[in-house]
Amino acid sequence: GLPEPKGILLLGVPGCGKSLTAKCIASEWKQPLLKLDIGKVFQAEVGSSENNIRQALSTAEAIAPCVLWIDEIEKGLSTAGGERDGGTNSRVFSTILTWMQERKKPVFVVATANKIESLAPELLRKGRFDEIFFIDLPTPEERYNIFKIHLAKFHQYGIKNLDELVNNTRGF
């Protein structure tokens, strides 16, 4: 009896690991990962954008169970510009919100965003995502572990001073 999880929203600066997290979720759950590039949904022809988003969501439901990764969701799903684009942005946004609220198939949504202030409040309402997580840049200890994992295959080059690498990569 527990309800199916709907999805999560991952917030953080570019390069902090949001996309990798989306890929890891699908891999861990052994489910296909579908990437929805919001920027490619929008077309100049009247009605094309709305049709593109409906087709993308139908594809995800046909493949379900799966993970639908919506990368940089704020770039295409804002309520701004509804007048300038003939309302296309608003209609695409509405289509996605309705689908997120009413979908019946097990499609887990992992949306990523760089700026929470760019997101429409409707997207953050209860019922759209199960959780919203902020992913920060790695701490020195986390950077040390990342280097240790990725440089292990280069042990023959004698990279031994991981502490120096960690200290030289603040802000990364």
List the predicted regions and their residue ranges.
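Walker A/P-loop NTP-binding motif of AAA+ ATPase domains
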Residues: 1-167
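A glycine-rich beta-turn/hairpin centered on an aromatic-Pro dipeptide
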Residues: 170
